[in-house]
């Protein structure tokens, strides 16, 4: 795990090699299980896709909030291994010296699996949470271009790299540029996956 700390207009973290080989094996087992149209569905306003000022849908991808699929978190490989973000009193988040990451705690979190294929993208939006942690995954060799994330109105580019995690305050505007699949091999499952963890504070539980 290689952690890079950034503290420009706002604090954020980029972590490469976030999951180890065994964790990746478990994650891919579940991603392959989920990668069917009746499981990962096209984003809609009703399913939580962000909208613009005029009500237009900003999100063009397939997605699913997987917490609602399982009665018990332990039944999901992804929901089991992604607990590492909160382990040891938020040890990973505490690597950043900024007061935001030094003090943040959650009493609620939820996880979304997203999948981007040809021409998919996500317009600039903010997340309805406190902290967003996005992990990008794709099958090697990479068979698409694009899918990079841009932070804030200054468009700070974070390249889409396999097994890279980006962690940032959820209120920071961000977007994903358009995916272009390799036309010679456009088969489903070879696009850009993203596992997004949202850490939130539910005041009703305080």
Language-model region placement:
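A structural signal for short, well-ordered beta-strand segments
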Residues: 111-113, 133-135, 195-199
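Conserved short histidine dyad/triad with adjacent acidic residue
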Residues: 112-127
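Short catalytic/ligand-binding loop motif for oxyanion handling, primarily in non-cytosolic enzymes
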Residues: 22-24, 105-107, 120-123, 143, ...
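Non-heme Fe(II)/2-oxoglutarate
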Residues: 1-98
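Catalytic core of Fe(II)/2-oxoglutarate
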Residues: 129, 140-206
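A short glycine-rich, His/Asp/Glu-containing loop-to-beta-strand
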Residues: 100-115
